Amino acid sequence: MRIAHLGHAELRTPKLEDSVDFFKNVLGLEETERTGHSVYMRAWGDWEHHTLILTEADRPGLEHVGWRVGAPEDVEAFAKEIEARGETVTHVEAGTEKGQGDAIRFTYPGGQMMELYYDVDKFQPGDKRSRLKNAPQKPPYRGLERCS
C-alpha cells in the first residue's frame, strides 16, 4: 500500500474564466475538458487527463488534493486504514471526476479534503505527440514561432 505521486488539485474560484485565462496564458496549462461549472487543465508534461480542476464557486479555496496510489487495491486498503483511525471516508464512483476511476475522499487532520485513486485516463496527444517515449507531448513553445 503506497502513494505513487501527487496527481491533481481542485481549486474553487469565483472568477472561472479569469482563472482559466491565467493558468492557460500565464502558466501554460492547457484545457482538456469542461463539464458543468468545472474546467479540467493539465501541464504539458503530465501523463494524466488533468493536473488541475478549476470549479466555479462563491468563494476561492481548495476543494481537494488528489493522490494516485500504487495499485488498484491500495484505494480500498487506504480506506480501511483511514476508517480504522476514526476518520470518515466517502467512496467516489468512477466518472464522478472526469478522467478518473473509483476513488475515496476524506478530510485529513489538517482540515483539507484528500482524494486517493488509481485508475485514470491517460492524456491523448493527437497531433502534439512527441517523438520521445518519455514525454507525453511536444513542448508548448509559447510566444515563439517555428522557423522553416
Where are these regions (language model features)?
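Conserved short beta-strand elements that form part of the metal-binding/catalytic scaffold
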Residues: E30-E63, M113-V120
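Short coil/turn segments at secondary-structure boundaries
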Residues: G66-E73, A94
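Vicinal oxygen chelate
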Residues: K80-G143
